[in-house]
């Protein structure tokens, strides 16, 4: 579990890889899949810092007409449900991620510390947070929150996490089915007009 995370480097234990190294590694192993006849790949991703880099790799592979690779993030597949379930969601360490882990790996969540995490973080995070005159003024998570947490984790439960997991799984299955139904040539870049 390592990705493009320099924006979290101020928090103990954060490990990250240089963006170019990450892209080259992902591209290399994806090309290996192509060697074995696989022509479609879904990168199942759970880290916002990886999104643009996975998409860049997908673009390179598609432009080379090697294979079609797309990035999928579980919470982006179910935004309405996430919005419905949580009053104060957040993009990092918030209730959606906490609830999902409470469902999948409850032993990793310290329920007795959720209020502390919330209180040391930023409960409300919106389009105006960390912006001045339309420009993002932050580069690192610590610029907005002392502990890296955004949202109110005390709203998380394993039951909510199960709802999110089941809904996201349905979306991933539907994406796999859609991708399998596509003609490979229709997934490639179109000719110049």
PLM features: residue spans?
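Extended, histidine- and acidic-residue-enriched regions that form the cofactor-binding/catalytic faces
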Residues: 1-40, 48-193
């Amino acid at each position: 579990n390592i990705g493009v995370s320099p924006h979290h480097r101020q928090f103990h234990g954060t490990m990250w890889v240089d963006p170019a190294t990450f892209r080259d590694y992902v591209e290399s192993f994806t090309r290996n899949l192509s060697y074995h006849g696989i022509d479609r790949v879904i990168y199942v991703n759970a880290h916002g810092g990886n999104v643009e880099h996975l998409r860049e790799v997908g673009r390179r592979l598609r432009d080379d007409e090697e294979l079609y690779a797309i990035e999928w993030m579980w919470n982006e597949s179910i935004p309405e449900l996430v919005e419905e379930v949580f009053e104060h969601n957040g993009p990092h360490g918030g209730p959606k991620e906490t609830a999902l882990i409470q469902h999948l790996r409850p032993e990793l969540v310290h329920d007795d510390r959720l209020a502390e995490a919330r209180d040391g973080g930023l409960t409300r995070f919106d389009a105006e947070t960390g912006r001045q005159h339309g420009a993002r003024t932050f580069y690192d998570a610590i610029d907005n929150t002392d502990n890296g947490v955004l949202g109110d984790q005390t709203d998380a439960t394993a039951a909510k996490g199960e709802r999110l997991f089941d809904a996201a799984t349905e979306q991933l299955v539907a994406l796999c089915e859609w991708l399998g139904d596509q003609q490979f040539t229709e997934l490639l870049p179109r000719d110049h007009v």
